[in-house]
Amino acid sequence: MQQQGEPSVLSLRPGGGGGKSRLFVPRFSSSSSFDLTNGGSEETPFPVKRENSGERVRFSREEILQHRESVQVSDEILRRCKEIAVELFGEEQSWGNHAAESKITNHTQHRHTETDNRDWHSRSQIPTSGKEWLRDDPREAKSTWQGSGPTPVLIKAEVPWSAKRGALSDKDRVVKSVKGILNKLTPEKYELLKGQLIDAGITSADILKEVIQLIFENAILQPTFCEMYALLCFDINGQLPSFPSEEPGGKEITFKRVLLNNCQEAFEGAGKLKEEIRQMTNPDQEMERMDKEKMAKLRTLGNIRLIGELLKQKMVPEKIVHHIVQELLGDDTKACPAEGDVEALCQFFITIGKQLDDSPRSRGINDTYFGRLKELARHPQLELRLRFMVQNVVDLRANKWVPRREEVKAKKINEIHSEAERNLGMRPGAMASMRNNNNNRAAVSGAADGMGLGNILGRPGTGGMMPGMPGTRVMPMDEDGWEMARTRSMPRGNRQTVQQPRFQPPPAINKSLSVNSRLLPQGSGGLLNGGGRPSPLLQGNGSSSAPQASKPIPTVEKPQPRSQPQPQPQAAPLANSLNAGELERKTKSLLEEYFSIRLVDEALQCVEELKSPSYHPELVKETISLGLEKNPPLVEPIAKLLKHLISKNVLTSKDLGAGCLLYGSMLDDIGIDLPKAPNSFGEFLGELVSAKVLDFELVRDVLKKMEDEWFRKTVLNAVIKSVRECPSGQSVLDSQAVEVEACQSLL
């Protein structure tokens, strides 16, 4: 029971208020008056016992609805409820109205489907009494804000930003274009972007100076690319126009003169910048001083290297080089130069030392310079790090300017691949094959999975790319040319290459199984042998297997009679087949490399190294096949390569025609997997016919090799269309009208 003197406070939370650990709520009576705002009466309808003050007590809906009959609601609450009901349902409601209760129950279901046509802006304000309304209503706040007045007008800025405001001047347009070109400049894109830079629109001296400043800043801040930027300066020096001097009687403004002036100003301004850095002694300027020191060092070394690379391109005279060296060494032969000057001097000699030694006029002066460098290498006041740096330059000259480590410079992608192949011991062109032949490796992996081998055959190293990998084992061969596991009675030879394979294949491998040996990696036969049984899957695929074939090991399973002669293996056909396999592998490697770098001269050199004229028709067929498999088909690169090989007398027209016939005979099968192959093949033939390398007589022979009528029509239409697009195409069609009609008669 409640104690006397304690006022009863009603809380809307279940269990009432009071905050006591044990609270008994008296029952409501019908005669008691109840006012939510004044605290209500002393009786409540539900006695609830709360043992824990933090516990939340919940009532059911039926219990809460009992309040309606037992509570006397104040007039203020009834008025508020009516106003809310009018807002929600459009008519007056009461607590005792059961229709309103039904509307409240179904309001959630219909509120999204009903159309609200009421005027919310013109509704009357809710009158307030002396007692404040404690509930915050967001709808009320929103309507109050909306009815406060018109929306304030946005104030526009005097000079608003606009992406299209104003047109760029010619100077700004050219500078912006040159910035984009220099940001994309790489050794691979050099030729293309160089032409764009020349055609950028340099039509005045001011534009020329801005462009040179951009090139100069990019070069000195990227010392690794100084060689490329120096070559760019040399190439565009004669292509850009010169302009008259702004001063009367002055020299004309040329690219070379402005560039050398920039180099001179940067070299002479380094001293002023160092003096400014020395004056920054305030502790608060420590970070700024360190940043400026790094930037000054980077700009000095970059400028020195750029001047050296310009000397190699004959754009800087040697007298300027000697002046720079003498400035860096200083006039006092006994004094120690500054650390930054010594480091710049070493970088300068690494760049141009060989050129100075090769010049008869500069060789003697160079001896004097290096005599001074030898003294600096032993100078006690010089930092030990710089003494080692100077000694490395002296040793470099003694070694005929051949560095112990390769100099870091910008390289092309194919150069990086070649270097990786040399370092990893991979065959030439393996990197291009690994990058472009993902489909072939996936096929090999799938074949291996089907045999239960997992992905062991799909590894890049297993295919004989790297020497010493498991796929390069040399296994002995029996008289039939089958590989056998080595036994103790057999000579071991190289212990590293004939060790027993650790992998034991499943029993299904030793059963009758048909596997295409072209899909398996080179030298994979050693992985498939196990248990001393011969492997019927594939033979050795390397040049080292040929001597094994000439010395057969007699089988011991079934001895033969003495009267019957022992069959001797035919070594020559085996050698020829291995030679053909090796040629096919090298051909695919050189073609993949050509398709990635598009250098016909390198491809020409690789074809010449094959030294197999009889294989040239097959080479033409492989070129067409690999090129048309690409996406998109490489029609133009294929035609360009083959025309170049014919012009250099590496291929003959007969070889080219035979290769086209070989591919044409395969087109019925290829066209099923590559629907675009017939049209691409026709475009390729049209390129050669337009160049008068082939004629329509060969096209007719190629069409005869095809059985599919639709493929014939597609190829011929593509040939005629490609020839017509050539400037002299109509004359070619007129001169070979008879052959064209013969081709059309096959359709």
Curated annotation (Swiss-Prot):
Region described as Disordered: spans on this chain: 1-54, 105-149, 489-580
Gene Ontology MF term list: RNA binding; translation initiation factor activity
Keyword vocabulary terms for this entry: Initiation factor, Protein biosynthesis, Translation regulation
Record carries keyword Hydrolase: no
Coiled coil (UniProt feature): none
One record GO biological process: regulation of translation
Residue stretches of biased makeup (Gly residues): 523-533
Positions with biased composition (Polar residues): 28-41
Domain MI: 582-704
Alphabetical list of SMART domains matching this protein: MA3, MIF4G
Gene3D superfamilies attached to this UniProt entry: 1.25.40.180
InterPro entries the record matches: ARM-type_fold, Initiation_fac_eIF4g_MI, MIF4G-like_typ-3
Known role: Plays a role in the accumulation of some potyvirus during viral infection.
PANTHER family: EUKARYOTIC TRANSLATION INITIATION FACTOR 4 GAMMA (PTHR23253), EUKARYOTIC TRANSLATION INITIATION FACTOR ISOFORM 4G-2 (PTHR23253:SF75)
Subunit structure: EIF4F is a multi-subunit complex, the composition of which varies with external and internal environmental conditions. It is composed of at least EIF4A, EIF4E and EIF4G. In higher plants two isoforms of EIF4F have been identified, named isoform EIF4F and isoform EIF(iso)4F. Isoform EIF4F has subunits p220 and p26, whereas isoform EIF(iso)4F has subunits p82 and p28.
Similarity section: Belongs to the eukaryotic initiation factor 4G family.
Protein name: Eukaryotic translation initiation factor isoform 4G-2
Encoding gene (name): EIF(ISO)4G2
